[in-house]
Amino acid sequence: SRYDALFMTYSQPIRWDWRLMAAQCYQESTFDPSAQSWAGACGLMQIMPATATRLGLSHDKLFDPESNIAAAARFLGQLDRKFSDISDRGERLNFVLASYNGGYHHIRDAMALARRDGRDQHRWADVSRYVLLLSTPRYYQDPIVKYGYMRGSETVDYVQRIRQRWQSYSGVRGGT
């Protein structure tokens, strides 16, 4: 994309493959710097205004490609550190992407459900099932769940699509 140099620059401090950031950007906005979602997310990396404020990104810079990518990289780095309990880097990437899309606390709720049910809370294959279940009352009303309902199918699909596009951008065939 025309933003690859920015992905290369801002992915380095967080030790991400720049092609993964590019794949995420495609999923977020199809590389449209003026994109705005129905929920109010803005710019290339679809940053919510409240998140932008927490990241030190002024609202007048939300649609600036470099500022938006730089802020998204800071946010991804923060999420990565919040999942330091997941030692496998490949697994951790799934949780970071899921949190970027669906919210950190919702993903932690799904992890708590997985743990309670004897599943591996550090494996996306196990936790993604609970992300999906957080759209059903039996699960989002469970006392262990602190943040309630989430549209889990969107988040699970988001992670899968980015991983697939990343493989494509990296020239990888098959695998995970």
Sequence positions of predicted segments:
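Catalytic glycan-binding domains that act on GlcNAc-containing polysaccharides
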Residues: S1-T176
